[in-house]
Amino acid sequence: MLGGTASLGGDRVTEYRTPAPAPAPGRVAPARGLVALATAMVVLGGALVAALYVLFVRTATGQRFDQAALLRIDTNPERTRDIVGVLSDLTIGVILAVLAVCMVVSLLRGRLAYAIAAAVLVAGANVTTQLLKHGLLTRPDHGYSYSTNNSLPSGHTTVAVSLALALLLVAPRFSRGLLVLVGSVAATVVGVGVVVTGWHRPSDVLASVGVCLAWAGLVSLWLLLRGSETPTSRREPGGHPGLALVGAVMAVALAFGYGVRPDGTWRDLVVHGCTVAAIGLGTALCLALTSRVVPHDV
């Protein structure tokens, strides 16, 4: 900031600058790269939702491919019933229980801001999903599905991903890698599960990941700008992308081993594999980026 000028001998003018205000005691200024990364997460998440909606909902070609992927990932009725039973347990009670854990962990560690961020992330992502699905977005009838009700984004996937991210926000640094791994497995299993049951198309699942990514970036940006960094804050380089990817691969292998695979042609198998891989990579990226951008004390 330009503070003023000083004259020397009537000829020379020297500019002086007012120093930037120091961070609050016990805090450090956020790195610009992390602020940029959090901002990019918000933009990327929003852009992903918009692109999926325009390409796979608004266009006839997109609807055809999306519906074909849905049909090729279907499995036998017995497996579907089992998956429905598991997904039905993702109720409001589960959300409240996980949020309660987040609150307790944050308060015990003296990090009220992180408890607030976790609650805002879960509430914001799930409310946004419901508003988009039932209020703001419509699905034109191009003749490729039996229902014209919009199903993008997936509510169940939003619940799973947002809860995994909330736990990642409040957990101590030593447990972050394990949470990235477990969260990637759980979120991918739920994402694949809602497609297998026929509740959602693949684009719905990926859109819910985009919603969660945007909200994770938003609350991370708030934590960074408010000065939640401390001198002991540390990050593992890259945010454990390897563990996130391993978790997604484990989830896909678990689904295949359980019988969630097509019984048709090689073409069906390729489409099936690409679909579950896209879901797994999307959830892994979301968790890895959030782990990278959020400060964690030992």
What do the PLM-derived regions correspond to, one by one?
Residues 2-93, 133-144, 274-278, 282-298:
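N-terminal transmembrane-helix/juxtamembrane module of multi-pass inner/ER membrane proteins
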Residues 36-40, 104-124:
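Interfacial segments of alpha-helical transmembrane regions
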Residues 48, 125, 129, 190, ...:
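Alpha-helical transmembrane segments of multipass membrane proteins
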Residues 87-110:
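Hydrophobic alpha-helical transmembrane segments
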Residues 105, 129, 133, 137, ...:
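Membrane-water interface at transmembrane helix exits
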Residues 116-145:
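Hydrophobic alpha-helical transmembrane segments of integral membrane proteins
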Residues 144-279:
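Membrane-embedded catalytic cores of phosphoryl/pyrophosphoryl-handling enzymes
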